[in-house]
UniProtKB/Swiss-Prot annotation:
Gene Ontology terms, MF aspect: heme binding; iron ion binding; monooxygenase activity; oxidoreductase activity, acting on paired donors, with incorporation or reduction of molecular oxygen
Topological category with respect to the lipid bilayer: Single-pass membrane protein
Residues carrying covalently attached carbohydrate according to the record: N364, N407
Family: Belongs to the cytochrome P450 family.
EC number(s) on file: 1.-.-.-
Known function: Cytochrome P450 monooxygenase; part of the gene cluster that mediates the biosynthesis of terretonin, a fungal meroterpenoid that acts as a mycotoxin. The first step of the pathway is the synthesis of 3,5-dimethylorsellinic acid (DMOA) by the polyketide synthase trt4. DMOA is then prenylated into farnesyl-DMOA by the polyprenyl transferase trt2. Methylation by the methyltransferase trt5 then leads to farnesyl-DMOA methyl ester which is further subject to epoxidation by the FAD-dependent monooxygenase trt8 to yield epoxyfarnesyl-DMOA methyl ester.
Gene of this entry: trt6
Domain of life: Eukaryota
Protein name: Cytochrome P450 monooxygenase trt6
Taxonomic path: Eukaryota, Fungi, Dikarya, Ascomycota, Pezizomycotina
């Protein structure tokens, strides 16, 4: 005969049943809570976490906003630079959620090959032809931003330089049909910012839920509108060019709309998405270098003397070359100052992102499992054994390096080195660095010859830290006044 079950036993059994059913949910929730807390720590202190990790080991794990990664010391840069088992494209796609609708503009594949090939074979080779048009755009854009007032007045370099870079880049990327269109310029600037914001918003969600969440997050939905707006603005330009070239097959345009078509050679691609990807990859990083260099120069104790040296270099070089490519090569003090600013404040303390497509064994016998995401630390740029007095801004540092070396390219802004990873290393290094270097030098020529500049009263610029990223102080202010340039630019 069965004994009746007591109320206490029933409750205990029910509770046990509930626990069994809910335990996977509770485990998942507790796990995600732990991950969420780690992500919050990274967002606030990612910079310090990398430095702390390197003090303990040359290889360590780091929970980032977009999940776990392995960080390597700078000494590993050479051995992973071109390792075929480590994928750059897979890493980029993962970081930017390219598998999710709305982020598919960042999907790697044949279109990305077209983009990379265009930058290397067309943009870089056309820099000499682009210098004069870029200078013209700089004159047209700088004047309304900084004015012709001979009195000291305040400007915000963060917003004004960003707009100037967007204008110059668009002149080379999309031609004069859209490069002066305020809506297009605003779109190219805002698309980058909002893409990062949307990607970061998704990063806080569990990976499996992200495709669903992206359908409702306002920041993600905004990306669809950018793509549609860009499509609406570009379609008339593309159609007009098709009609013009149908009438005159020899008609050509010196910009990436034309160059993408030539490079593709029949391969499928979306010209609108390629333009957005190009803007995403170039405008903000180039502007950040210009802004940081100006802030560093103005903060230098010997700024007056340094400014005279820079101006003399620009004037003598311009009188010899005009707006021709050799001019840029002769601006050696400027080149050194730019590279020093990039050394002191890179855009991130880590770089060279990769995903292991198969297990990889490092030189110290560490095994990197398949599927692992890797980053390489940039901290060699602050190593006193490599750069004496590394925390001091020395605008002549790389000029001395060039003068002391038998290799003329040593220490140039665009040169690559495992001790200076701002542009990466190896075949996957930034292909647009030559164009970016030309842009920033053209802009600095105009600014230094046309304006007296100094930091606004009380302004002490300090880079903004966000995770492992470093951004030139967006709150910094300058005082500027128009001066008469010694040569007509």
């Amino acid at each position: 005969m069965l004994e009746p079950v007591s109320t206490a036993q029933s409750l205990w059994s029910f509770g046990l049943w509930i626990l069994v059913i809910l335990s996977p949910v509770l485990f998942f929730a507790s796990r995600e809570l732990g991950i969420l807390n780690a992500k919050k720590r990274f967002a606030k202190n990612g910079f310090e976490e990398v430095l702390a990790g390197l003090r303990k080991s040359d290889v360590f794990g780091l929970m980032t906003i977009n999940g776990p990664k392995i960080v390597l010391a700078p000494k590993f840069a050479q051995e992973i630079r071109s390792n075929p088992a480590l994928s750059v494209s897979a890493f980029s796609s993962s970081e930017l959620h390219a598998h999710i609708r709305g982020f598919d503009v960042f999907r790697q594949g044949e279109a990305d090959d077209i983009l990379q090939d265009t930058v290397r074979s067309k943009i870089t080779q056309s820099i000499g032809d682009l210098i004069q048009p870029l200078s013209e755009e700089c004159s047209l854009t700088l004047k309304p931003k900084w004015t012709d007032s001979p009195e000291w007045h305040e400007v915000c370099p963060h917003t004004t330089i960003l707009d100037i870079i967007a204008r110059l880049s668009s002149r080379a990327f999309i031609g004069d049909e859209l490069c002066r269109n305020p809506k297009w310029l605003r779109l190219t600037v805002d698309f980058t910012v909002d893409s990062f914001r949307a990607a970061e918003a998704l990063n806080w969600w569990p990976y499996a839920l992200r495709p669903l969440v992206a359908r409702f997050l306002p920041s993600c939905l905004k990306l669809h509108k950018y793509i549609q707006d860009a499509d609406n603005m570009m379609k008339p330009v593309l159609e007009s060019r098709r009609q013009a070239q149908a009438k005159d097959p020899q008609k050509s345009y010196p910009d990436t709309i034309q160059w993408f078509e030539e490079t593709a050679q029949g391969r499928p691609y979306d010209p609108v998405r390629l333009q957005l990807t190009l803007a995403f990859a170039s405008i903000h990083t180039t502007a950040d270098l210009v802004i940081q260099t100006i802030l560093d120069l103005c903060s230098a104790k010997n700024w007056d003397e340094l400014c005279r040296s820079l101006r003399e270099e620009i004037i003598s070089s311009f009188r010899e070359e005009g707006w021709r490519k050799p001019l840029l090569a002769k601006l050696k003090i400027m080149d050194s100052a730019l590279k020093e600013s990039q050394r002191l404040k890179p855009v991130s303390i880590v770089g060279m992102g990769r995903i292991a497509k198969e297990a990889v064994k490092l030189s110290n016998n560490t095994i990197i499992p398949k599927g692992t995401r890797l980053l390489v630390s940039n901290t060699a740029m602050w190593d006193p054994e490599i750069y004496p007095d590394p925390r001091t801004y020395d605008p002549y540092r790389f000029l001395r390096l060039r003068e002391a070396s038998e290799n003329e390219s040593a220490g140039q802004l665009v040169s690559l080195s495992p001790t200076h990873l701002s542009f990466g290393l190896g075949k996957h290094a930034c292909p647009g660095r030559f164009f970016a270097a030309a842009e920033v030098k053209i802009i600095l020529c105009h600014i230094l010859l046309k304006y007296d500049i100094k930091l606004a009263d009380g302004c002490k610029p300090k880079p903004l830290r966000a995770g492992t990223n470093l951004v030139a102080d967006p709150t910094a202010k300058l005082l500027v006044r128009r001066r008469q340039e010694e040569v007509a630019l």
